[in-house]
Amino acid sequence: MSRLSLSQLVLLSIEEQRLALDEINQQLEQKTAIERVIWALEHLPNQFVLSSSFGIQAAVCLHLLTRQYPDIPVILTDTGYLFPETYQFIDELTSSLQLNLKVYRAEISSSWQEARYGKLWLQGIEGIERYNQINKVAPMEKALKELQAKTWFAGLRRQQSKSREHLPVLSIAKGIFKLLPIVDWDNKQIYQYLKQHNLPYHPLWEQGYLSVGDTHTTRKWQEGMSEEETRFFGLKRECGLHE
């Protein structure tokens, strides 16, 4: 089977594109995570990248991908507001997994943003979305362009939130192929993989955090809360990168 061509797919009608991807996804649903990665490396365009927020379970996808493609560029969008433990976790995994880390940031610093706009994350859903556009979406778009990405791997999982429960393994996002190798994994599989390969959870896992982003929009999980409610004051789940 030849490599999938995005240029050929975009010539198809929307319905034909959907049908083509549906057929492929039916096959990918039957594969294991590692088989999906191997399939993608063999059949998708070969400017590969992996994005990571270095969140609670980030070590899984970082290990899974780099064992098959050691030099894959790993994109981090750094807002400047990550937890100190997150920066330490980034350093730890970059060293232990020998990551080819590529860090992208907003064009203006976090302090300058606050001087210009105030604390956007306290300005309701519109403020949060503007903050995400400046600090997450725009840097990611720059990364994908500069790295000439044709295939984008990410560690999203259906179990993480209602907004993710119908995600396909393979899709087209931001004009490139996007593959989610562990999309159907549950928390038990995550735990087993980390244990099997002697990989760490994010340090804040032990303190009761289920999901970790910026210090100002991340809450520790409490009884009765959903995972979605631990981020962005429960107003939204996604930071804009995967919407």
From Swiss-Prot:
RNA-binding is among the record's keywords: no
Leading EC class: oxidoreductase
Active-site residues annotated for this sequence: 239 (nucleophile)
Coiled-coil annotated residue ranges, if any: none
GO molecular function: phosphoadenylyl-sulfate reductase (thioredoxin) activity
Primary location recorded for the protein, binned into one broad class: cytoplasm
A Pfam family per the record: PAPS_reduct
Record-linked InterPro entries: PAPS/APS_Rdtase (IPR004511), PAPS_reduct_dom (IPR002500), PAPS_reductase_CysH (IPR011800), Rossmann-like_a/b/a_fold (IPR014729)
Name of the protein in its database record: Phosphoadenosine 5'-phosphosulfate reductase
Phylogenetic placement of the source organism: Bacteria, Pseudomonadati, Pseudomonadota, Gammaproteobacteria, Enterobacterales
